[in-house]
């Protein structure tokens, strides 16, 4: 081989070696990049990274079905409250959202607190595998793509001590699976939720100067939103922060959302078109008008929920958009709306999304939640007072606001398609500015009642036939109860508020002594109020006690009566109330239920009668049943009409209580021996009573009564002697459910062993 060939060969080998080296380096770089990518995808993410991932992998994963295959039909809103005006929620857009977004960004910083990108990618794949064509599909999408991330971010804020206190960031959850507590168990779930003509007629016939005597004062339709934002109170208990509803994406057409929500008189136009039953001949105009009708009805439904559940905040979730809503309690007739359309506002993905991440659905809903936490939900007397104002101020679909024409709106028969389209590419601007409040958005106290209506010539609408005397004054009193006293010194208004129960619960021994006619219990925290003229006896007997409670609640269902917790302290058919009997200071609880569930409370009363000698020890002291003629209002416009009076049983046993199950079995054995099968193994029905040092059992509405075991044994001894019975022959006369308990008791207690002749 010549030198030239040798050199050529060496050069070729050198080049091959360099190529292999470069290839190895490239492979190493690729492996390193892949490793870094995997590490990046599997490590937790920062706040901004998480927002980007949620939008890219979850929100953009939504796939909609062809509208021809989607659910059809209008939202049922007949008889529901709707606002007169729709205005942009500029305070949220310009003040609240920027403030809260900056707050969350500051608290989270660059800490890696949230789900890895791989998790959101995998979930996004699952979302994209299912087409969404109805509310149920949107429900699943909203939970995965929006609600779960929002809840995770709020959880981080709740653990931040400074932010938790300063901005009232509590523990929070979306409750989208509400039990239908307002319907009887056997009631058809497909019942129409519209108000009947009879209900509307009764509502219209209600006298303006009469005190409310029944729930017929209001619209009596079943109101059950798709979901409620539930926040945990610092001192325990839960309350609603906002209401939300899911809508199929095609029912809130995103191409018409901005133009429709920019129309101040959207509701009037839609109601007028429906009442006149007039359709445009232009197909394009028809599509727009139908889209506006769908949007107006979706907004009306949530607005009605906001009013009747006593909250100022709500939203409509329709997949491609969120409609964030707010109503000021100083102006019930105006609904403020912020349309959130992330696909348009965020745009196509780029390398740097930082300046647009605040427009994502998750970011905007976080700010919405934080805004709602600054407002207290109305309940009890304040809710009823507010609804009195709403009833006098608002119209129900499809009644018309008589004075809308005087605001400069053309009658529907004179309006043209062109005039209706003027707002399609513009945003509404009104001379009447939004309130501009930054956080609380509450009414200002003054020496005069706040005006229900905005300034102008709108007062002609509400004459004597539609208003109630003192409604505004009552509302001021309600506001003061919820928000605390002001510096205005409205002593007269504050005096209008019914006193709430404030004392500790009476002891079991105290209320048992009252029922049995025995001496006072000196250990009762309220014994000084029970004692009259230095006597050691109770000032009233059990019958007089029940009658006095009834008379006190007849004057007002809110006098000395307060619902403990609508969302937490509730059973299968009732809610828990704390009561105080004035002036004797007896403090106890009531189990309240709806008018059509009286039979279940009566059954529970019969169970307590069977367990009479166990009252105050194994079960609470039963003090009778009363009717509230006026009814105690609940969120959603239902009324507690009947209430069973009892002693307070105690608290749920702590998880660290080692012998809780043993004590529970002892109490179950005790009631079983009296012929009662509890029939409800819910943990909330077994409470630790420190006074008696045992587990007390409550809620007997599902209990089954059977002859006590002792009575059976005596009955068998009195019969002629026949062939010797075995335990199995004895059990053939008992139901299968009873048999299981008998077997257990035969193993534990001689009292449960059946007697045999011979």
UniProtKB/Swiss-Prot annotation:
GO terms for cellular component: cytoplasm; nucleus. Residues 181-190, 457-468 have a biased composition (Basic and acidic residues). Disulfide bonds: none annotated. The keyword Coiled coil applies. Residues 180-230, 414-499 are annotated as: Disordered. Promotes unequal transmission of alleles from the parental zygote to progeny spores by acting as poison/antidote system, leading to poisoning of progeny that do not inherit the allele. May possess DNA nuclease activity that leads to spore killing, and a kinase activity that confers resistance to the nuclease activity. Can suppress meiotic drive by the P.comata SPOK1 protein. This is Meiotic driver SPOK4. It comes from Podospora anserina. The gene is SPOK4.
């Amino acid at each position: 081989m010549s030198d030239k060939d040798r050199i050529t060969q060496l050069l070729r080998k050198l080049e091959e070696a360099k190529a292999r080296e470069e290839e190895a380096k490239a492979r190493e770089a690729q492996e390193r990049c892949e490793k870094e990518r995997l590490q990046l995808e599997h490590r937790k993410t920062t706040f901004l990274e998480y927002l980007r991932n949620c939008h890219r992998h979850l929100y953009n994963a939504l796939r909609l079905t062809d509208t021809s295959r989607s659910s059809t039909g209008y939202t049922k809103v007949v008889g529901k409250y709707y606002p007169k005006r729709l205005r942009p929620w500029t305070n949220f857009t310009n003040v609240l959202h920027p403030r809260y977004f900056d707050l969350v960004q500051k608290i989270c910083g660059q800490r890696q607190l949230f789900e890895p990108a791989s998790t959101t990618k995998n979930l996004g794949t699952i979302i994209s595998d299912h087409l969404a064509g109805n509310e149920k599909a949107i429900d699943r999408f909203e939970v995965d793509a929006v609600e779960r991330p929002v809840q995770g971010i709020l959880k981080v804020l709740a653990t931040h001590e400074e932010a938790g206190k300063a901005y009232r960031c509590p523990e929070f959850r979306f409750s989208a699976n509400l039990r239908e507590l307002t319907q009887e168990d056997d009631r058809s779930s497909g019942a129409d939720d519209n108000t009947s003509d009879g209900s509307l007629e009764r509502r219209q016939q209600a006298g303006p100067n009469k005190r409310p005597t029944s729930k017929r004062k209001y619209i009596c339709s079943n109101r059950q939103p798709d979901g409620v934002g539930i926040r945990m109170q610092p001192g325990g208990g839960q309350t609603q922060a906002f209401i939300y509803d899911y809508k199929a994406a095609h029912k809130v057409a995103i191409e018409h959302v901005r133009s429709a929500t920019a129309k101040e008189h959207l509701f009037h136009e839609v109601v007028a078109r429906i009442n006149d039953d007039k359709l445009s001949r232009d197909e394009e105009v028809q599509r727009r008008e139908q889209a506006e009708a769908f949007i107006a009805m979706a907004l009306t439904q949530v607005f009605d929920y906001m009013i009747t559940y006593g909250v100022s905040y709500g939203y409509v979730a329709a997949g491609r958009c969120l409609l964030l809503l707010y109503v000021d309690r100083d102006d019930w007739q105006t609904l403020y709306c912020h349309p959130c359309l992330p696909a348009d506002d965020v745009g196509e993905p780029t390398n740097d999304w930082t300046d647009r991440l605040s427009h994502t659905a998750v970011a905007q809903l976080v700010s919405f939640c934080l805004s709602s936490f600054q407002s207290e939900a109305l309940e009890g007397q304040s809710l009823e007072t507010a609804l009195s104002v709403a009833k006098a101020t608002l119209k129900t679909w499809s009644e018309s606001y008589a004075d809308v024409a005087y605001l400069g709106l053309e009658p529907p028969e004179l309006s043209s398609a062109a005039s209706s389209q003027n707002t399609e590419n513009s945003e509404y601007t009104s001379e009447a500015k939004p309130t501009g409040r930054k956080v609380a958005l509450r009414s200002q106290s003054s020496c005069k009642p706040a005006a229900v209506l905005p300034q102008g010539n709108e007062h002609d609408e509400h004459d004597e036939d539609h208003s109630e005397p003192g409604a505004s004054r009552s509302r001021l009193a309600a506001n003061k109860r919820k928000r605390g006293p002001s510096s205005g010194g409205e002593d007269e208004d504050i005096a209008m508020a019914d006193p709430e129960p404030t004392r500790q619960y009476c002891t079991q021994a105290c209320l048992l002594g009252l029922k049995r006619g025995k001496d006072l219990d000196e250990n009762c925290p309220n014994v000084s109020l029970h004692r009259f003229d230095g006597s050691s006896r109770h000032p009233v007997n059990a019958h007089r006690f029940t009658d006095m409670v009834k008379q006190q609640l007849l004057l007002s269902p809110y006098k000395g009566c307060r619902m403990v917790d609508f969302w937490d302290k509730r059973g299968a058919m009732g809610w828990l109330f704390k009561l105080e009997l004035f002036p004797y200071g007896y403090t106890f609880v009531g189990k309240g239920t709806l008018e059509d569930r009286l039979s279940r409370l009566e059954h529970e009363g019969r169970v307590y009668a069977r367990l009479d000698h166990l009252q105050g020890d194994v079960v609470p002291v039963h003090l009778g049943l009363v009717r509230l003629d006026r009814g105690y209002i609940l969120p959603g416009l239902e009324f507690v009409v009947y209430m069973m009076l009892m002693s307070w049983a105690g608290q749920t046993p702590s998880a660290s209580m080692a012998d809780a199950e043993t004590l529970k079995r002892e109490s179950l054995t005790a009631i079983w021996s009296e012929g009662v099968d509890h029939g409800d193994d819910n943990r909330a029905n077994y409470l630790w009573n420190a006074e008696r040092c045992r587990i007390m059992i409550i809620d007997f509405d599902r209990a089954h009564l059977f002859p006590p075991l002792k009575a059976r044994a005596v009955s068998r001894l009195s019969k002629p002697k026949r062939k010797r019975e075995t335990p199995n022959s004895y059990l053939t006369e008992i139901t299968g459910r009873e048999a299981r308990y008998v077997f257990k008791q035969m193993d534990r207690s001689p009292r449960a062993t059946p007697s045999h002749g011979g």
